[in-house]
C-alpha cells in the first residue's frame, strides 16, 4: 500500500504554454508526454462509491496497472489517501490479487468481481517534471486530455503535485511558487469525481447552501475549528466550479463561503488569536476587492490572489498553523469539548439576535443584515452536536428573516421575526434544555 499525497490544480486552457515554460525553468528532471488510458469500474448499485473506493485499470505503452484508491482526507485539493497498485499482464480486473485490507469486511465480497463493469474512461497525455523541494522529492504532472462517459465528455487540463518522498509541507511550499502566475485554480474534484458525474447523466450542478456542520461525538474545540474552516473551503471551491461554468448565483455563494472563513476565525477568536490568521485575512481582503471590481469569473478564479488565498487556507489547515500561537491557557481551551463550547456560544448568539430583533426596526432592518448573516453562519457551525431536525427548524426562522429582509417583504419580516425570537433553545443552557 502507498499513501498518496497530492495537490490538484485546474489549469486555464489559455495558460498551458506559459505554465509549461515556467515548469521548464525549474531545476529537475523532465519527462516527455506519454499517453495514459484509464478505465474506471463500478457496479450498477455503485457499491464501490458507497464504500468510498475507486477502481481503475491504467494502460501505458502496453503495460497495465490495476489500482484501488480508498477515501482519505481532502482539504482544498490536497488529497491524502491509501492507494493499492497491482501490475497486471492485460487490461482485465483481477480483484483477488488485492490484499484483504482493501475490502471493508476484510475479504472480497461474494459476486463483486462479476458485478463490476466499466463506467467511464479518461484518456490524457501526462508530461512530468521531477523536482526537489526542501527535503522532499515531488512529481509535477501536467495532464491534458478528456474524461468520457457514454455520450458525455469533459476536458482534462490539470496540474498535480504528488509527494514521492518527504513531507506534505514541501508540496505546499512548491505550490506557493507556482501560483504566483495566473492560470491555476486549486480544485478538489478529481478526474474520477467528474467521471461519475458524467456517467450519472451530467446533470447541471446546483447551488449548495451551507448546511449545519456535522461533527463527530466527543469532538474537541480544535476539531470543530478545523471542521468549520474545511466546510468553508469546500463551499468556496464547489461554487467556484459553478461560477466558472456560468451558473447564476454562484459568485454570491463564493463570497458567502469566504465570509464563512472569516466568521469561523471570529467564532474561535477567543482561543485562536487574530495574529495567527492575520496573513490569511489580508489575502481574503485582496480577493474580495478583486471580485468586487466586476472582473470575469475566469480572471477572478484563476488569479494569483485567489490561488494564494486558498493555498494559504489549505496550508493553515494541513499544518495546523494556529498551534504555534497558543499559550498554555489557550491550549487547554482548544483541547476542551466542542459541545460545551457550542452550548456557551449558541446562548450568546441567541441573546445577541434577541437583542437586535426583540422589537420592530421599521425601515432599519437592512442595517442589521451583516450581523444577522454572521450569527446564522456561527449557529450553522455550532449546531452539529445536536438533533438535526430541531436545529434546522430553529435556524429556518432566522434564515427566513434574512431572506425577507433581503427581498424587502415587510409582512414576512415581522412574521419571521416574531417566530424567531419566541423559539425555545434546542441546546443546553443554564443547566437545562
Predicted regions and their residues:
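Function-determining surface determinants
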Residues: 1-433
Amino acid at each position: 500500500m502507498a499513501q498518496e499525497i497530492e495537490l490538484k490544480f485546474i489549469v486555464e486552457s489559455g495558460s498551458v504554454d506559459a505554465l509549461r515554460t515556467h515548469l521548464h525553468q525549474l531545476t529537475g528532471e523532465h519527462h516527455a508526454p506519454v499517453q495514459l488510458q484509464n478505465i474506471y469500474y463500478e457496479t450498477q448499485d455503485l457499491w464501490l462509491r458507497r464504500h468510498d473506493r475507486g477502481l481503475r485499470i491504467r494502460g501505458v505503452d502496453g503495460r497495465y496497472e490495476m489500482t484501488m484508491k480508498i477515501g482519505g482526507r481532502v482539504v482544498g485539493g490536497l488529497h491524502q489517501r491509501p492507494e493499492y497498485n497491482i501490475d497486471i499482464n492485460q487490461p482485465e480486473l483481477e480483484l483477488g490479487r488485492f490484499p484483504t485490507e482493501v475490502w471493508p469486511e476484510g475479504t472480497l465480497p461474494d459476486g463483486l468481481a462479476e458485478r463490476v463493469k466499466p463506467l467511464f474512461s479518461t484518456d490524457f497525455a501526462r508530461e512530468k517534471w521531477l523536482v526537489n523541494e526542501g527535503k522532499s522529492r515531488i512529481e509535477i504532472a501536467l495532464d491534458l486530455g478528456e474524461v468520457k462517459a457514454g455520450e458525455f465528455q469533459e476536458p482534462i487540463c490539470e496540474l498535480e503535485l504528488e509527494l514521492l518522498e518527504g513531507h506534505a509541507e514541501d508540496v505546499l511550499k512548491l505550490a506557493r511558487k507556482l501560483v504566483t502566475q495566473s492560470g491555476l485554480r486549486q480544485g478538489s474534484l478529481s478526474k474520477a469525481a467528474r467521471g461519475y458525474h458524467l456517467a450519472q447523466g451530467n446533470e447541471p450542478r446546483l447551488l449548495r447552501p451551507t448546511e449545519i456542520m456535522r461533527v463527530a461525538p466527543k469532538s474537541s474545540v480544535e476539531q470543530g475549528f478545523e471542521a468549520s474552516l474545511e466546510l468553508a473551503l469546500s463551499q468556496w471551491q464547489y461554487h467556484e466550479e459553478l461560477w466558472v461554468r456560468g451558473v447564476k448565483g454562484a459568485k454570491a455563494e463564493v463570497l458567502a463561503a469566504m465570509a464563512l472563513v472569516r466568521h469561523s476565525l471570529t467564532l474561535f477568536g477567543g482561543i485562536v488569536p487574530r495574529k495567527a490568521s492575520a496573513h490569511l485575512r489580508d489575502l481574503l481582503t485582496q480577493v474580495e476587492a478583486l471580485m468586487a471590481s466586476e472582473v470575469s469569473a475566469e480572471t477572478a478564479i484563476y488569479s494569483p490572489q485567489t490561488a494564494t488565498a486558498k493555498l494559504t487556507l489549505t496550508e493553515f489547515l494541513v499544518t495546523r498553523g494556529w498551534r504555534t500561537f497558543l499559550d498554555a491557557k489557550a491550549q487547554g481551551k482548544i483541547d476542551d469539548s466542542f459541545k460545551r463550547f457550542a452550548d456557551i456560544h449558541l446562548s450568546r448568539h441567541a441573546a445577541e439576535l434577541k437583542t437586535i430583533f426583540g422589537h420592530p426596526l421599521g425601515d432599519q432592518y437592512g442595517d442589521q443584515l451583516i450581523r444577522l448573516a454572521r450569527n446564522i453562519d456561527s449557529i450553522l457551525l455550532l449546531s452539529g452536536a445536536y438533533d438535526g431536525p430541531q436545529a434546522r427548524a430553529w435556524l429556518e426562522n432566522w434564515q427566513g428573516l434574512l431572506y425577507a429582509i433581503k427581498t424587502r417583504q415587510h409582512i414576512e419580516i415581522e412574521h419571521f421575526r416574531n417566530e424567531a425570537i419566541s423559539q425555545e433553545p434546542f441546546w443546553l443552557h443554564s443547566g437545562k434544555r
